[in-house]
Amino acid sequence: MAVISMKQLLEAGVHFGHQTRRWNPKMAEYIFTERNGIYIIDLQKTVKMVEQCYNVMKEIASEGSTILFVGTKKQAQEAIEEEAKRCGMYYVNQRWLGGMLTNFKTIKLRIDRLHKLEKMAEDGTFEVLPKKEVIKLRHEMEKLEKFLGGIKGMTQMPDALFIVDPRKERIAIKEAQTLGIPVISIVDTNCDPDEIDYMIPGNDDAIRAVKLLTATMANAIIEGKQVEQTEE
């Protein structure tokens, strides 16, 4: 059975690209036509490429490897968090902090600090500290949780990145390229496909489209993890 159907893609509006004046000519081969000043993505190609990315994600997960979900634009935040949690992976959905990959050592120190503050909140340390100090520490903890909560369980570099909107997440992509980490991404008509290892041509602005494609990739991970368990 196909991992995604043409009907699902159409219903979620995956075929709607950007306005024709905002396009990247490198995406020409994935465009079916132009309608009312908007590019329409060729969903036959999308179906095939979703299948390819699904198999890549499944393969990575079956090896017990880690995939980091990244989508910080408003339309992607909820789907990125929900689907990463559903398939037991990590995510960044607020802001990509420069060096999250290339300077992971420093990021790790901030994650350790978050764990320390959480422990202090749990073990009663906050109750014996001056009120002013507790307010300050809670504020620090909330800020760290906001930006690092999705990766606080990540002890080492991810083996791959799944990205919504490579234009928005260009720093994440640059860092992944520097470290040779493969990138799987939804790529709209205004993006550069050359930066991506495994792409899904599709609408990265509609909440339903982002949710459908992100959920499909999460399904691939869940399936891959089951393969890993049966092999064990």
UniProtKB/Swiss-Prot annotation:
A Pfam family this chain is assigned to: Ribosomal_S2
GO molecular function: structural constituent of ribosome
UniProt entry tagged with the keyword Oxidoreductase: no
Keyword entries, A-Z: Ribonucleoprotein, Ribosomal protein
InterPro entries tied to this protein: Ribosomal_uS2 (IPR001865), Ribosomal_uS2_bac/mit/plastid (IPR005706), Ribosomal_uS2_CS (IPR018130), Ribosomal_uS2_flav_dom_sf (IPR023591)
Gene Ontology biological-process annotations: translation
GO CC terms: cytosolic small ribosomal subunit
Alphabetized SUPFAM superfamilies for the sequence: Ribosomal protein S2 (SSF52313)
Protein family membership: Belongs to the universal ribosomal protein uS2 family.
Protein name: Small ribosomal subunit protein uS2
